[in-house]
């Protein structure tokens, strides 16, 4: 596996490749990330991964400086997955000049849910993904369903800019107790880690209620948030939305595929999760 930091060297290395499968990450790789590499291999060859902690998607009071950076361990894991190239640019490589041009998602998708609680987050995501796509020029790119809203925004951006890249969605990988794997799980204390699976369990309860015919979506959301709050969580949202556009469904939308999404703080750690219904 080649480890490359220069955009020009990356382009030189990939010249002539027309079936590249790309997996962008911020590093601190876990089994969830590695499952993306394996899925990428099913859709293209060679597999290219990137590791870049993107300052543009962190707010002023978020964890950019303490976000775990474990490059050497990540390299070992990617080598075992037979990744062809790891693109690991420095901030100077990616942004040699201030990134004055940004990609802003539409308000109705980018400023709701995660976008409401993390202003500017999806602008940072879209900008770096667009730049990475320009560098790698992949045939396919793999994104996880755990970041459901991000997946939808990236897919829509790719379509609207007519990028020659198919976006492949990967299922969320969970620990045996149901907790979705996340690089931020390492911030949890032992007590918090024992409590953390309640987020997925709460979503599962909402899912079962909807499947059983409960169409009072607003009450289901309120009750789920209250249940988490009673256990010491600080929920930002639990939202039942249409999968196609993340718009809140009406009670009469009987056939619309739905998803329930959540974000909540447990101690100092903010966790997100979702379940398709």
From Swiss-Prot:
Gene3D superfamilies per record: HUPs, Pantoate-beta-alanine ligase, C-terminal domain
Binding site for (R)-pantoate: 57, 150
GO cellular component terms given for this protein: cytosol
Enzyme Commission designation: 6.3.2.1
Misc remark: The reaction proceeds by a bi uni uni bi ping pong mechanism.
Chief location category: cytoplasm
Protein name per Swiss-Prot or TrEMBL: Pantothenate synthetase
């Amino acid at each position: 596996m080649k480890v490359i930091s220069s955009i020009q060297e990356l382009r030189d290395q990939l010249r002539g490749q027309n079936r590249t499968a790309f997996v962008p990450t911020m590093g601190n790789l876990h089994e969830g990330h590695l499952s993306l590499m394996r899925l990428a291999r099913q859709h293209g060859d060679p597999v290219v991964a990137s590791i870049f902690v993107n300052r543009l998607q962190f707010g002023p009071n978020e964890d950019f400086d303490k976000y775990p950076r474990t490059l050497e361990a990540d390299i070992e894991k990617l080598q075992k997955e037979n990744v062809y190239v790891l693109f690991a640019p420095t901030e100077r490589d990616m942004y040699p000049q201030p990134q004055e041009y940004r990609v802003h998602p539409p308000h109705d998708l980018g400023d709701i849910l995660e976008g409401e609680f993390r202003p500017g987050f999806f602008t940072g995501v879209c900008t770096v993904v667009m730049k990475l796509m320009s560098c790698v020029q992949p045939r396919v790119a793999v994104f996880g369903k755990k970041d459901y809203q991000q997946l939808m925004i990236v897919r829509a951006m790719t379509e609207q800019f007519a990028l020659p890249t198919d976006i492949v969605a990967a299922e969320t990988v969970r620990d045996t107790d149901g907790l979705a794997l996340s690089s931020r799980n390492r911030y949890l204390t032992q007590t918090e880690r024992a409590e953390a699976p309640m987020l997925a369990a709460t979503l599962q309860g909402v899912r079962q209620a909807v499947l059983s015919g409960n169409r009072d979506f607003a009450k289901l959301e309120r009750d789920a948030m209250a249940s988490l709050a009673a256990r010491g969580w600080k929920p930002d949202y639990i939202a039942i939305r249409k999968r196609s556009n993340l718009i809140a469904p009406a009670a009469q939308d009987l056939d619309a595929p739905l998803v329930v999404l959540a974000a909540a703080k447990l101690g100092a750690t903010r966790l997100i999760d979702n379940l398709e219904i």
